[in-house]
């Protein structure tokens, strides 16, 4: 597929940002897209700024001059992270990773500018990258119906992005800052940078979609929730959201829960728990980043996640969803949602830090992600008072994968959608549900065919072959033409002909390649599970800085 593409140097006058050197990717000899990689959107979060909210660039910050344009032809630096199926090369790993990549369609923009898709990468909030080859988005932006500027930010992950403790909270309080959720604050600052500067690249700052896959979809939800309840409407940025294969999650852990994780980390690093707050933080900030990564491997509380802080994450958020206020605010602001699933999400999920073959191992593994209260509810829901493997599961590994997939995707999506519909949003007009029961042939390049239509397999549907050597074949392009056009229209802000009319309706790509609308046969199970884990919150667990 890349044989038809070539790279050319591209010097661009970015107005008040200065002059920058990017790339023009040509297709069959004609300019297709312009690419700029690794543009900083915040000051480096290093040294004393490790484990603190991101800092804006100075107003007079310039990326380069006419005589010495800044070189942005590669990608972003990548946050240090534990090994995974896509472990980054050490040469691009750095805590100084608050940068973003931009793809701009070649040619003159529309009258009001290109629509903008701000796309957040996934990876459980622990791993991942916003980098992909500059050529990877040519098919989407030049050879499909989709025309928009793509902005892919890097943000802090794992311990660097989501460590929380009483010591950090005390320091943040004394500095007048928020604590925890640094990765979410990074994303927000990148979104604000985009809103403030994208017009310089030909973008329409009033037409921004936030999208993401997996943890990127969860992050997308967090960005929407934060904006609905913590940002005045006149300062709102988000026009619509696309959440691919994830949902709202459950009420995040409290500071007390997160403190247990921090204590475990300190012990693994050999830092005395009896030290003063200041001494603990000085010791933590003195640890080299590679040692902080190594210390995470094998932790019992392995997942560094969102903190229920009431600054970024409203403590009463689940109540606001359940009582219709979330839907009401979406309706008032005209925000629409695209959200759905792959049929076998669990096949991939059961391979992420898989627990051993026992009830207690699964229980402990879920505790790494969720609060003790939520974990207990989940295990009692499936296992009752017994500690035996429930009927219908081959082993504990499969059980974990299916339960994790229901929490991350299947069941909580349905509960969320139900609350939105009950709150006044309309199927096929405000909320666009979908389901994939087939995958592209090219996906076998990275994901075994026997894993089926599992998590991640639909990314090249939405991004039109991105990241895969062969991309879509001609038959697949015909089958998925309507999906591509629907996504393009959605991001453009126009009316989408999705085909769904009722809350239970899902647009579906079937095994035979055809598209239809089916009735959701897991709707009631999802509502029951949502009520179990996401109702009854009082929103009074206490602020993070208390």
UniProtKB/Swiss-Prot annotation:
Active site residues according to the UniProt entry: 214 (acyl-ester intermediate)
Transmembrane segments annotated in the record for this chain: none
InterPro entries from the UniProt entry: AB_hydrolase_fold, CarbesteraseB, Carboxylesterase_B_AS
Additional facts recorded: Fusarium verticillioides possesses 2 unlinked loci, FDB1 and FDB2, necessary for detoxification of antimicrobial compounds produced by maize, including 2-benzoxazolinone (BOA). The FDB2 cluster arose as a duplication of the FDB1 cluster with rearrangement and expansion by incorporating additional genes.
Catalysed reaction, written as an equation: a carboxylic ester + H2O = an alcohol + a carboxylate + H(+)
Region (Disordered): 72-91
Protein name as it appears in the record: Carboxylic ester hydrolase FVEG_12634
Enzyme type, top EC level: hydrolase
Magnesium found in the keyword field: no
Organism: Gibberella moniliformis (strain M3125 / FGSC 7600)
Role summary: Carboxylic ester hydrolase; part of the Fusarium detoxification of benzoxazolinone cluster 2 (FDB2) involved in the degradation of benzoxazolinones produced by the host plant. Maize, wheat, and rye produce the 2 benzoxazinone phytoanticipins 2,4-dihy-droxy-7-methoxy-1,4-benzoxazin-3-one (DIMBOA) and 2,4-dihydroxy-1,4-benzoxazin-3-one (DIBOA) that, due to their inherent instability once released, spontaneously degrade to the more stable corresponding benzoxazolinones, 6-methoxy-2-benzoxazolinone (MBOA) and 2-benzoxazolinone (BOA), respectively.
Induction or repression: Expression is induced in response to 2-benzoxasolinone (BOA) exposure.
EC number(s) on file: 3.1.1.1
